[in-house]
């Protein structure tokens, strides 16, 4: 049986890593998220998130982060193995349901990063 965990090594944690991804990655936009994808030298995908104070208070920001992490945790085997993915939440995401987050981020799994422009 496959483990559906999100290990510490599968997260992007260092500021230096975020800056490198922002500088060299390909940006894609959906209605509620901006996605930056960059190649890495590892054998597994890594997730990073940015949720600013424009989203709302800490409760709302943490809720969005939990939803994004859950989507990634359940779908990480469908991402390319050597990718760093940073998901930036836009200001109107705080009231989204998990199904809406899955539907919108599911676009990542079916299209190339430069082609994702769903508004």
From Swiss-Prot:
PROSITE patterns xref list = RIBONUCLEASE_P (PS00648)
Enumerate the catalysed reactions: Endonucleolytic cleavage of RNA, removing 5'-extranucleotides from tRNA precursor
The protein's matches in Pfam families, at most eight in alphabetical order, are given as: Ribonuclease_P
Q: Which UniProt keywords apply?
A: Endonuclease, Hydrolase, Nuclease, RNA-binding, tRNA processing
Gene Ontology CC terms: ribonuclease P complex
Name the Gene3D superfamilies for this protein.
3.30.230.10
Please describe the quaternary structure of this protein.
Consists of a catalytic RNA component (M1 or rnpB) and a protein subunit.
Name of the molecule in the record = Ribonuclease P protein component
Q: Which organism is it from?
A: Syntrophus aciditrophicus (strain SB)
Q: What's the name of its gene? A: rnpA
């Amino acid at each position: 049986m496959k483990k559906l965990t999100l290990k510490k090594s599968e997260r992007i944690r260092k500021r230096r890593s975020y800056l490198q991804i922002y500088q060299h990655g390909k940006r894609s936009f959906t209605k509620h998220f901006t996605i930056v994808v960059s190649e890495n030298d590892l054998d597994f995908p890594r997730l990073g998130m940015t949720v600013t104070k424009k989203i709302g208070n800490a409760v709302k920001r943490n809720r969005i982060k939990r939803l994004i992490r859950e989507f990634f945790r359940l779908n990480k085997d469908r991402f390319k193995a050597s990718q760093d993915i940073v998901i930036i939440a836009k200001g109107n995401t705080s009231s989204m349901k998990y199904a809406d987050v899955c539907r919108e981020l599911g676009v990542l799994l079916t299209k190339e990063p430069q082609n994702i422009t769903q508004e």
